[in-house]
Amino acid sequence: MKSIQIDKFGGPEVLVIKDVEIGKPGPKEVLIKNLSIGLNFIDIYHRTGLYPIPLPSGIGLEACGVIEEVGADVSLFEAGDRVTHASMPIGSYSEKQIMPEEKLVSVPDGISDEVASCITLKGITAEYLLHRAYPLKKGDKVLYHAAAGALGQILCP
């Protein structure tokens, strides 16, 4: 299968399309055919080495796809289910990837692959900021520094 990989840190020129082998899903894992991927600043941080990752490596944390195969003991999903994720392991810039079932979210029929693949990480971040980092209470005021960005559009309807 084709996968965008990096062998060294740097600019966009270090992104290389390679043919790579993908194994079978192990216990509690699924094989996903990626239909759409999300592009995020953290991908750039990984590519440049600002947030170092072991090399060589695939790149990308966010995708939407269809499960092609399930490993042993998978109980939440089955082949044919449409799912999204925004988490490790890195490697969503690829045709397929293996993911732990616990990292997946079902995608409702009314949401396109493109929307599902680009909103998941931002949605998780919004939930974390508003409910975990500092649980907002009635009357709290919030200053948004980047309301025009993807996260800002979720936080500032």
Where are these predicted regions, by residue range?
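Nucleotide donor/acceptor-binding cores
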Residues: 1, 81, 139-141
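Hydrophobic/small residue at the entry helix of a nucleotide-binding pocket
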Residues: 151
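Glycine-rich beta-strand-centered segment in the early N-terminal region that forms part
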Residues: 21-38, 48-91
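Short N-terminal binding/cap micro-motifs at the start of the first secondary-structure element
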Residues: 10-17, 41-43
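Conserved hydrophobic/aromatic beta-strand scaffold that supports enzyme active sites
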Residues: 17-22, 64-66, 96-98, 104
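N-terminal Rossmann NAD(P)H-binding glycine-rich loop of SDR-like oxidoreductase domains
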Residues: 148, 156
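NAD(P)H dinucleotide-binding glycine-rich loop of Rossmann-like/cofactor-binding domains
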Residues: 85-146
